[in-house]
Amino acid sequence: MEVTRKLIKTLLLVFFMGNLLAYGSNQDPKENSESDATGTEMYRDIEFASQNAILRGRLYLPENKSKKSPVIIMAHGFTTTINGMTADKYAEKYREAGFAVLLYDHRNLGISDGKPRRDVNFWVQSRGYIDCIDFVVTQPEIDASKIAVWGASMSAQEAFLVGSIDERVKAIVTMIPGFESTFPAEDKDGKLYAFAKKAVMSDDIMGMSHTVIEQMPIVSSDQIGTPSVLVEITAYRWFIEYGGRFGTNWNNVVSYSDIETPELYHTGQCAPHLKAPVLMIVATNDEMDGANPEVTYEIYKMVKQPKEWVDIDGGHFGLLHYPSALFDKSSKAQITFLNKYLN
């Protein structure tokens, strides 16, 4: 897969001036438990190992703890973090609906460890989901037979890949998935899927031959003077509004590394290999190049497992605004889907 600035936009799409390189909320990356309106603790801090780094996050537990709970594994989209950038609001909704949630920051981002800081690698992040599952099944409150993976934008593509590899996954939720702007080629002999599976399960993904795009701003209001990875004005507005909030640990800078892949590889080739039902929540008016709804629909048609499609308005970032009617529509559809396949 040729790594270019356009590819970054393609893989990322995001889920998420002074000195743009310094813009962000850079407080001490420390998380604390938090209680709901009734005084019940909503989550506890957790950590687990992945690719020689410690990843950190929150384990949300429902109020009814009389039995083991189904769990949703959540990681945010491109460069975004778990505190204050809307994924935490989705986690709270799932907890209210009776699900446990493990929400964590990807390697190199937020409160998780890993170097180089703010470097994004699709394969390393995908492996993080699998290592997270390894961890969560050891928790006494969790029903290890009822696990869902969740992703938005770039991480939707990661959850999709993981759902084609890990037999423990029983449901897959993808919001505004970033399946790139090109249609997947046919994987006649299954070798492209086999490559992806082998790559994700490698013990040292970063030790594989790879290329790196150096740090640059994620968003910018001045594409001539300070060009950025994401050029859409909606991306700029969302990232600055949500990432700039106190305590997010988000910074407006990113580098991107990618392993060498076969020329025709495309994550959509994993569709026939999914191990579980999938929900796709798709913005039919998505403005991001790498979240082309037509490409997503072609991949949807390739899925052999039970599948559901939900159209949503608001472009790529509409359902990431909280509170909003689009957030409510999205979370309701997800809870209905998860109740069907995890309860």
Description of each model-found segment:
Residues 31-67:
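N-terminal cap/lid segment of alpha/beta-hydrolase-fold proteins
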Residues 79-92, 106, 292:
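The serine-hydrolase catalytic nucleophile loop
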Residues 82, 107-144, 324-329:
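Catalytic nucleophile-loop/oxyanion-hole region of alpha/beta-hydrolase
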Residues 93-113:
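Conserved alpha/beta-hydrolase
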Residues 160-241:
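Alpha/beta-hydrolase-fold enzymes
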Residues 274, 280-282:
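Short beta-strand/loop motif that positions the catalytic acidic residue
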Residues 287-295:
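Conserved alpha/beta-hydrolase "acid-adjacent" motif
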Residues 315-327:
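Catalytic histidine-centered segment of alpha/beta-hydrolase-like enzymes
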